[in-house]
Amino acid sequence: MEESAGTPFHDPKYFVSPFILNTDEGRYLVLKAIKLCNVRTIDCMKQETSCVLKVDKPQSPCPISSSDSAPKCYMQQTSPQQQRQAPQLRFINTGALSNLFANTTDKAARVINQ
């Protein structure tokens, strides 16, 4: 049975074909969606609402550009002082880790076999 990230292709509740969703904020590429069945929709009339909870939209590191031709991502630049203060996490090469594990395993096997 073919599956796409845990959702079967034959199940009518899932859309596995990508599509574009146009909104006021921009265009979104939807890779997977779930079809809603028998879910109640409540329309909100602004004149009749008594209390609305306002939630500020989080700022994206990539601002939405006005032109749709070539969207570019502008990451926030940090000053050299901020870069020096931030600790850098160093990663060990996975090849070095596997060699270390293999050497330790070999040494342990030799000790046990003696």
UniProtKB/Swiss-Prot annotation:
Phosphorylated on two serines. InterPro entries: Phosphoprotein_F17. Keywords: DNA-binding, Host-virus interaction, Inhibition of host innate immune response by virus, Late protein, Phosphoprotein, Viral immunoevasion, Virion. The keyword Ribonucleoprotein does not apply. Its main location: virion. The modification Phosphoserine is found at residues 60, 69. GO terms for biological process: symbiont-mediated suppression of host innate immune response; viral protein processing. GO terms for molecular function: DNA binding. Residues 58-86 are annotated as: Disordered. It is found in: Virion. GO terms for cellular component: virion component. Belongs to the orthopoxvirus OPG062 family. Self-associates to form high molecular-weight forms. Interacts with protein OPG157. Interacts with host RICTOR and RPTOR; these interactions disrupt the mTORC1 and mTORC2 crosstalk. Plays an essential role in virion assembly and morphogenesis. Also plays a role in the inhibition of host immune response by dysregulating mTOR. Sequesters host RICTOR and RPTOR, thereby disrupting mTORC1 and mTORC2 crosstalk. In turn, blocks the host antiviral response in part through mTOR-dependent degradation of cGAS, the primary poxvirus sensor. This is Phosphoprotein OPG062. The gene is OPG062.
